[in-house]
UniProtKB/Swiss-Prot annotation:
Pfam families: AA_permease. The chain crosses the membrane at residues 26-46, 47-67, 98-118, 124-144, 160-180, 209-229, 246-266, 278-298, 344-364, 368-388, 410-430, 433-453. The gene is serP2. It is found in: Cell membrane. The keyword Transport applies. This is DL-alanine permease SerP2. Disruption phenotype: Deletion mutant is only marginally affected in medium that contains only free amino acids as a source of amino acids. Mutant shows almost no change in serine and L-threonine uptake, but shows a strong decrease in L-alanine uptake. SerP1/serP2 double mutant is completely devoid of uptake activity of either L-serine, L-threonine or L-alanine. The lineage of its organism: Bacteria, Bacillati, Bacillota, Bacilli, Lactobacillales. PROSITE patterns: AMINO_ACID_PERMEASE_1 (PS00218). GO terms for biological process: amino acid transport; transmembrane transport.
Length: 460
C-alpha cells in the first residue's frame, strides 16, 4: 500500500480531523505524565534513592523506541484509527483479534480504576456525597463531551495537560528558588548536593533497584495513546512526527526535572514513601492548601486518563468492527454527524458504568484491584506484539525508507523487546507482583487458545 493510496484513504474517512497540532502536542505531554508522578514519586525514590533517575531514563528510552515504531507505521498510513490495526495487517487476523480485544479490555479496566480514583478525589472535598453518584455524573459528563466533534476532546485534553505541566514547573521553579536562597528545611539546606551526598547506586540492594523498574514502567503506561489519534488529526504526518520527536525532552524535563527538584530539597532518605512529595514541598513554602492543590491536580490527571480511555476504547471497538465481519460488531461502525463512532462510545460507557457497583461492594472491590493489576501487566504484552509487528512492517512492501524511519532499528527494536521481556520476567520475582503476573499469563494462554481455534471472519 503506497503513500498516495493512504492519502486517498484519509480523505474517505467518516471521522472528522478536528484535532489540531496544539492538541496533539499537549496530548503527547499529558500521556507522558501520569498520576503516579504526583502520588508515587516518594515511594519510588524511597525504594532505590537517586539511582531512580537512571531507571526513568531507561524506561523512557524503551517507550520512545516503541513510540517511534508506532509513529513510523502511522506516518506511512495515518488513516488508521488504532495503531493495533497494523498487527492484523502484518501478523494476521488472529494475532490482531487477540491483541485488540486484550487491549480493549485492559483499557476498560484502567478506565474503571480511574473513575474510582476520581470518586475518591472528589470525596476529599465532598465527604458526604456518595462516591457512586460522583462516578456516574463524571462518566455521563465525559461521555457527552466525547459525542461532540473530536476538537472538543482535544481542547479538554489540552487544558488537563496544561494543569499537570503548571504543577510540575511550579515544583521545579520552587526548587530553583530554594537552592539559590540556601533555604533550610529544618533538617538540611536545600542543595543539589543532597542528591550526590553519600551516593550509592544500590542503597537498598540490587533487588530494590530492579523492583523500581516495574513501578516506573507502569507510570509510563498509556503513552501509546497518541497512536489512537492519527485518523482524527489535521495534517497528521508532520503533527505526529513533531509530537513523538519531542517526547525525550519532555521525559527529561518533567520526570527527571521533578525528581531532581524533590531530591535537592530533601535528602532522599527523609522523603516519606507514603506521602506525595508535591504536598510536602508546597507546604514547605507556605501553601497551607497544598493537599487540596495536589488533589486537584491528580483529579484532573485521572479525568484526563478516563477521557483518553473513552476515546481509545471507542476507536478500538470501531477498528475491530471494521476489520472483522462479525454481525454483532456491525453497529459499532456507525458514525454520528460529528464524526464520532457513537454506538461504540455508548457501549464503552455502559461497560464502565459497572464501576459504581464495584465501588459499593467491598468483596468485588478487592478482587478488582487484582484484576486491574493483571490488566496493567498486559500492556507489556501489547507493547511486545507491537514491536514484533513493526519488524514485520520493515520487511513488507509497505515500508517507506523515505518516511519517519527509526534510525538503527535493527539494534534498537531488539533492545526494546529484550527490555520489556526482562521487566515482564521481573514481575515473577516479587511478592507484590507475582500473582497478577501469573494472572496475565493465564489470560494470554486461555484467550490465546480461544483465538487460535476460533474462526475469524475478516471484513473485505
Amino acid at each position: 500500500m503506497n503513500t498516495n493510496q493512504n492519502d486517498e484513504n484519509i480523505e474517505k474517512q467518516p471521522s472528522q480531523r478536528g484535532l489540531k497540532n496544539r492538541h496533539i502536542q499537549l496530548i503527547a505531554i499529558a500521556g507522558t505524565i501520569g498520576t503516579g508522578l504526583f502520588l508515587g514519586a516518594g515511594k519510588s525514590i524511597h525504594l532505590t534513592g537517586p539511582s531512580i533517575i537512571f531507571v526513568y531514563l531507561i524506561i523512557g528510552a524503551l517507550m520512545y523506541i516503541l513510540l517511534r515504531a508506532i509513529g513510523e507505521m502511522l506516518y506511512q498510513d495515518p488513516s488508521q484509527h488504532s495503531f493495533l490495526n497494523f498487527v492484523s495487517r502484518y501478523m494476521g487476523a488472529k494475532p490482531g483479534y487477540f491483541i485488540q480485544w486484550s487491549y480493549l479490555l485492559v483499557v476498560v479496566f484502567v478506565a474503571m480504576a480511574e473513575l474510582i480514583a476520581i470518586g475518591t478525589y472528589i470525596n476529599f472535598w465532598l465527604p458526604d456525597l456518595p462516591i457512586w453518584m460522583t462516578e456516574v455524573f463524571v462518566l455521563v459528563l465525559l461521555t457527552l463531551l466525547n459525542t461532540l466533534n473530536p476538537k472538543f476532546f482535544g481542547e479538554t485534553e489540552f487544558w488537563f495537560g496544561m494543569i499537570k505541566i503548571v504543577a510540575i514547573i511550579g515544583l521545579i521553579l520552587t526548587a530553583i528558588i530554594l537552592i539559590f536562597s540556601h533555604y533550610h528545611t529544618g533538617t538540611d539546606t536545600v542543595s543539589l548536593t543532597n542528591i550526590t551526598k553519600g551516593f550509592e547506586f544500590f542503597p537498598n540492594g540490587v533487588s530494590s533497584f530492579f523492583e523500581s523498574f516495574q513501578m516506573v514502567m507502569f507510570a509510563f503506561v498509556s503513552m501509546e495513546f497518541i497512536g489512537m489519534t492519527a485518523a482524527e488529526t489535521d495534517n497528521p504526518r508532520p503533527t505526529l512526527k513533531k509530537a513523538i520527536n519531542q517526547i525525550p525532552i519532555r521525559i527529561v524535563l518533567f520526570y527527571i526535572g521533578a525528581l531532581l527538584a524533590i531530591m535537592s530539597i530533601y535528602q532522599w532518605r527523609d522523603i516519606p514513601a507514603d506521602k506525595s512529595p508535591f504536598v510536602t514541598i508546597f507546604q514547605l513554602i507556605g501553601i497551607k492548601w497544598a493537599a487540596a492543590l495536589v488533589n486537584f491536580v491528580v483529579l484532573t490527571s485521572a479525568a484526563s486518563a478516563l477521557n483518553s480511555a473513552l476515546f481509545s476504547i471507542t476507536r478500538n471497538l470501531y477498528s475491530l468492527s471494521q476489520l472483522n465481519d462479525d454481525k454483532i460488531l456491525k453497529p459499532f461502525t456507525k458514525f454520528s454527524k460529528a464524526g464520532v463512532p457513537v454506538n461504540a462510545l455508548l457501549f464503552t460507557s455502559l461497560l464502565i458504568l459497572f464501576t459504581p457497583f464495584i465501588s459499593m461492594i467491598p468483596a468485588i472491590s478487592n478482587s478488582f484491584v487484582f484484576i486491574t493489576s493483571v490488566a496493567t501487566n498486559l500492556f507489556l504484552v501489547v507493547y511486545l506484539m507491537t514491536l514484533i509487528t513493526y519488524l514485520k512492517y520493515r520487511k513488507s512492501k509497505d515500508f517507506d525508507p523515505s518516511g519517519f524511519t527509526l534510525p538503527a532499528a535493527h539494534i534498537f527494536i531488539p533492545l526494546a523487546i529484550a527490555g520489556f521481556v526482562l521487566i515482564f520476567i521481573s514481575l515473577f520475582c516479587f511478592k507484590d507482583t507475582i500473582i497478577p503476573a501469573i494472572g496475565s499469563v493465564i489470560w494470554v494462554l486461555i484467550f490465546g487458545l480461544f483465538t487460535f481455534f476460533r474462526k475469524i471472519k475478516t471484513a473485505d
